[in-house]
């Protein structure tokens, strides 16, 4: 296959929105991280719910992970 015959790859996300996605995703992730921390500090061992802990931590890690991904893309580290 010739190089000229191949179509150029275009990103599904416009690079102009990388900064906005970074800030929004990291802010949401920090909110859920803070919520998880406050929940852990203020609850006793009798009032803790493992499913709530797992859900909050999963959501926080997903938002923080994608936020860091777009941060890396924003600064030019293409992963």
From Swiss-Prot:
Membrane topology recorded in Swiss-Prot or TrEMBL: Multi-pass membrane protein
Pfam families reported for this sequence: Ost5 (PF05251)
Keyword tags: Acetylation, Cytoplasm, Endoplasmic reticulum, Membrane, Transmembrane, Transmembrane helix
Record's subcellular location: Membrane; Endoplasmic reticulum; Cytoplasm
Keyword Transport: no
Membrane spanning stretches: 17-37, 55-75
InterPro entries reported in the protein's UniProt record: TMEM258/Ost5
GO cellular component: cytoplasm; endoplasmic reticulum; endoplasmic reticulum membrane; membrane; oligosaccharyltransferase complex; oligosaccharyltransferase complex A; oligosaccharyltransferase complex B
GO biological process terms on file: epithelial cell apoptotic process; inflammatory response; protein N-linked glycosylation; response to endoplasmic reticulum stress
Pathway: Protein modification; protein glycosylation
Residues with the N-acetylmethionine modification: 1
Recorded GO MF terms: oligosaccharyltransferase complex binding
Tissue expression: Ubiquitously expressed.
Subunit relationships: Component of the oligosaccharyltransferase (OST) complex. OST exists in two different complex forms which contain common core subunits RPN1, RPN2, OST48, OST4, DAD1 and TMEM258, either STT3A or STT3B as catalytic subunits, and form-specific accessory subunits. STT3A complex assembly occurs through the formation of 3 subcomplexes. Subcomplex 1 contains RPN1 and TMEM258, subcomplex 2 contains the STT3A-specific subunits STT3A, DC2/OSTC, and KCP2 as well as the core subunit OST4, and subcomplex 3 contains RPN2, DAD1, and OST48.
Protein task: Subunit of the oligosaccharyl transferase (OST) complex that catalyzes the initial transfer of a defined glycan (Glc(3)Man(9)GlcNAc(2) in eukaryotes) from the lipid carrier dolichol-pyrophosphate to an asparagine residue within an Asn-X-Ser/Thr consensus motif in nascent polypeptide chains, the first step in protein N-glycosylation. N-glycosylation occurs cotranslationally and the complex associates with the Sec61 complex at the channel-forming translocon complex that mediates protein translocation across the endoplasmic reticulum (ER). All subunits are required for a maximal enzyme activity.
Record-stated family: Belongs to the OST5 family.
Official protein name in the record: Dolichyl-diphosphooligosaccharide--protein glycosyltransferase subunit TMEM258
Organism: Homo sapiens
Taxonomic lineage of the native organism: Eukaryota, Metazoa, Chordata, Craniata, Vertebrata
